[in-house]
Amino acid sequence: IYCIGPGTLAKNLESSVPAAKGFLANFWKAYPEIKRYVDNTISKGEKDGEVKTLFGRRLRVDRERPYVAVNYVVQGTAGDCMKISLYRAHKYLKENGGKIRNTVHDQMLFDDIDEKQIPEIHKIMENFSFSMPMSVDVLHSEKSWGDLVEV
């Protein structure tokens, strides 16, 4: 989906370019709706010089490199989800106690939350109306990073 070319794919898989071309051809054949989405997004980036996240945020695309448009939409939408989740979690914790200590890339770190709050925060972070569900991993520790356990 990130528009990797056969040369880069072959290198990453330590394979031959013809094998990578075959893999890509089979992938696009198996998932024509993804191929259509990729082609349309690249075309829009090239034609308009911009694309939009699923939330409508505009992202500029260099018309000389329109293939980046797909990744921009995917990563931009993920960033939007993170910002929305951060706002929702902050609002919830302000009303119910606890703090957001920090964010690291696509993670939120919390302090002073009750274990009973974890399921609600988990729900807040996954609550998006996409045709495909969003999954969020939740780890918890009372002491340190070394003691993290999946919830």
Where are these regions (language model features)?
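Conserved catalytic core of nucleotide polymerization and phosphodiester-bond processing enzymes
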Residues: 1-151
